[in-house]
């Protein structure tokens, strides 16, 4: 019994230390980007020595992968649910943008880091698991599908190809990383709704 209790304690301590490192990595990655981040900087932020960080993670890319995994999974899962809901394209686009901003708020700053670093870029992809790469692309594809649906129904009129427009929408949301902080004057949903109205005012087909 004592041995089992000790093993449980060891597992709990191991998990807690990993979480401490992952939490410390967020602000370091946000400040420096993946390229400018070092294990030394993460260790300083966590109040640990470099050797301790290396004990838990093989390199900064392993930290990066784990730090963003849950947020990316939640974001894509949320967008999948919205894509299946019985909504008109304008409402689906609005709810998709809300879903993205809510996920950004809950997983701040990890999700911003993922998209800022260029999900789908060759440099980043070499250090990500295939499921993360696919998830980043899936998020844009779901926005694109909503745009195509709106064009098909006659509700949207675009001056850009749907794929480019989807990148514009995601890029606009990503840009909020320059100024958005959780619990600020504007909530994630406030921002999403305001941006959606701005977007829709430019693409919704108006009746003459």
Task: Please report, for each region that a protein language model flagged, where it lies by residue.
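All-alpha amphipathic helical-bundle segments outside canonical DNA-binding/catalytic cores
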Residues: 90-94, 130-135, 152-168, 186-193
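Short hydrophobic clusters on alpha-helical segments that form packing/core surfaces
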Residues: 17, 21-29, 100, 199
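Hydrophobic alpha-helical connector segments
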Residues: 66, 80-109, 162, 166-169
């Amino acid at each position: 019994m004592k041995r089992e209790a000790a093993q449980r304690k060891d597992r709990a301590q191991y998990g807690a230390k990993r979480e401490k490192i992952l939490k410390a990595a967020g602000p370091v990655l946000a400040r420096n980007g993946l390229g400018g981040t070092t294990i030394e900087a993460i260790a300083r932020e966590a109040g640990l020595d470099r050797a301790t960080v290396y004990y838990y993670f093989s390199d900064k890319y392993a930290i990066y992968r784990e730090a963003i995994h849950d947020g990316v999974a939640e974001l894509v899962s949320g967008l999948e649910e919205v894509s299946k809901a019985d909504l008109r394209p304008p409402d689906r686009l609005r709810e998709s943008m809300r879903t993205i901003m809510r996920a950004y708020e809950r997983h701040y700053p990890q999700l911003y880091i993922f998209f800022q670093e260029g999900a789908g870029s060759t440099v980043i992809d070499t250090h990500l698991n295939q499921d993360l790469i696919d998830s980043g692309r899936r998020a844009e594809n779901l926005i694109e599908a909503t745009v195509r649906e709106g064009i098909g129904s006659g509700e949207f009129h675009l001056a850009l190809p749907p794929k480019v427009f989807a990148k514009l929408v995601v890029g606009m949301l990503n840009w909020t990383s320059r100024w958005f902080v959780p619990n600020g004057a504007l909530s994630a949903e406030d921002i999403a709704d305001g941006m959606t109205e701005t977007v829709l005012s430019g693409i919704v087909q108006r009746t003459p």
